[in-house]
A protein has these predicted regions:
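A long, amphipathic alpha-helix that forms part
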Residues: 213-234
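A short acidic-Thr-Gly-centered motif at the start of a beta-strand
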Residues: 33-45, 193-196
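His/Asp/Glu-rich, glycine-adjacent segments
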Residues: 1-32, 65-74, 81-219
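Short acidic, Gly/Ser-rich segments with clustered Asp/Glu that frequently serve as metal-coordination loops
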Residues: 55-59
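Catalytic cores of glycan-processing enzymes that make or break glycosidic bonds
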Residues: 46-47, 96, 225, 229
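Short hydrophobic beta-strand that contains or immediately precedes a catalytic carboxylate
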Residues: 50-53
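Short, solvent-exposed loop/turn and secondary-structure capping segments
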Residues: 60-64
Length: 234
């Protein structure tokens, strides 16, 4: 794995990926789309299923089999945005805007309005998990860091399209039509349900899976195993 510092390329990053989706559904945006994805969407698909595997980047994919599905279906490689955190990246997909426009930059952010840190995806207080926003006089998610979700943008620009999302329970809902899925089995079942029962409906489905949790867990188990082996050798 290279130690080279990779800077965001805002002409070829995840922002351009979601911009292509917005462009496909006639949403006006000032950001540049991704040419490789634009070309793919020229086939005018009836349904678009957009799956985000959080944390499953290029270095991990490069260690998979050359005969595998991901390798054979690869059409491009883009950078993330800055900062390249889960919250910043996912909100780029949700808003169709970069972090420097939305203000969503970290998993936990301090707000002077509360004098507390808030987990951005769950809207809960970071240390005690309390819902301090409900009883507060101001909701920063309705003002300071508010954005228009792409689901709403798409349905406004293309009224014949129904936009859905499937996301984990820890994440706040951003679409009018939202289904929860906390593992791969639930994900696959949900996608199958959509495709089977909504074939007559044009829609956009965005799926968020926290793959980095499983990857980090595997790395932790490997480190513990290596430490155990070293201790036994001594």
């Amino acid at each position: 794995m290279s130690n080279e510092i990779v800077l965001p390329n805002y002409k070829h990053c995840i922002l351009n990926t979601i911009t292509s989706i917005l462009k496909y559904y006639n949403v006006e945006t000032k950001h540049k789309s991704l040419e490789s994805l634009d070309k793919l969407l020229e086939k005018k698909y009836k349904n678009v299923v957009f799956i985000v595997l959080d944390g499953m980047g290029e270095h991990i994919l490069n260690n998979l089999s050359n005969n595998g599905y991901f390798f054979n279906k690869k059409i491009d490689c883009v950078t993330s945005v800055y900062p390249s955190t889960t919250t910043a990246a996912l909100t780029t997909y949700y808003a169709g805007k970069p972090p420097y426009e939305t203000g969503w930059i970290a998993w936990s952010q301090y707000f002077k309005e509360y004098g507390r840190a808030i987990d951005m995806l769950s809207h809960k207080e970071s240390y005690k998990g309390e819902d301090i926003i409900k009883g507060a006089s101001i909701n920063v998610f309705d003002g300071v860091v508010k954005y228009t979700p792409i689901f709403e943008q798409i349905e406004k620009a293309s009224p014949n399209v129904k936009a859905f999302e499937i996301n984990p329970t820890y994440s706040d809902k951003r679409a009018k039509r939202s289904i929860r899925a906390n593992n791969l089995d639930e994900l696959i079942d949900s996608i199958e349900t959509f495709v089977t029962h909504l074939l007559k409906t044009l829609y956009l489905l965005i799926q968020i899976i926290q793959m980095d949790y499983y990857i980090n867990l595997e790395l932790l188990l490997m480190k513990q195993k290596n430490l155990y082996m070293k201790q036994n050798i001594k």
